[in-house]
């Protein structure tokens, strides 16, 4: 059997019948078929812009400067007193120490704000609630630097 390698015909195995297989010249593809395939590819890409001078002349930076994201809303910190979680040791009977967190006793509390003539819902520690009852909401908020009109 004859095989085709790079356009050259090879003779098959020579046995009792000395047959030779010759391969005729390969017919080239017609130009119209090639151009139609090319136009199909270009029509698929017709909506895309490959290059543009609009971005080159622009003086605006390509990257956006990094802005840190907003802090999480439900942090375990009292905004009025600044109390945070305490890292303590959990001590077993065998005196084996492991770290644990002692959280602040935070409570959601709706407090009447006299200057604003409305209720303000705050997340406060129990110590801050006692301080507000003693000194007043305006005095404690002013000392902590908190604007109650945004709450």
UniProtKB/Swiss-Prot annotation:
Gene Ontology molecular function, alphabetical: structural constituent of ribosome
UniProt-listed GO biological process terms: translation
Origin species: Nicotiana tabacum (Common tobacco)
Gene Ontology cellular component annotations, sorted alphabetically: chloroplast; ribonucleoprotein complex; ribosome
Subunit structure: Part of the 50S ribosomal subunit.
Transit peptide feature range: 1-74
Family (UniProt): Belongs to the bacterial ribosomal protein bL28 family.
SUPFAM superfamilies registered for this protein in UniProt: L28p-like (SSF143800)
HAMAP family associated with the record: Ribosomal_bL28 (MF_00373)
Keyword vocabulary terms for this entry: Chloroplast, Plastid, Ribonucleoprotein, Ribosomal protein, Transit peptide
Protein name: Large ribosomal subunit protein bL28c
Subcellular location: Plastid, Chloroplast
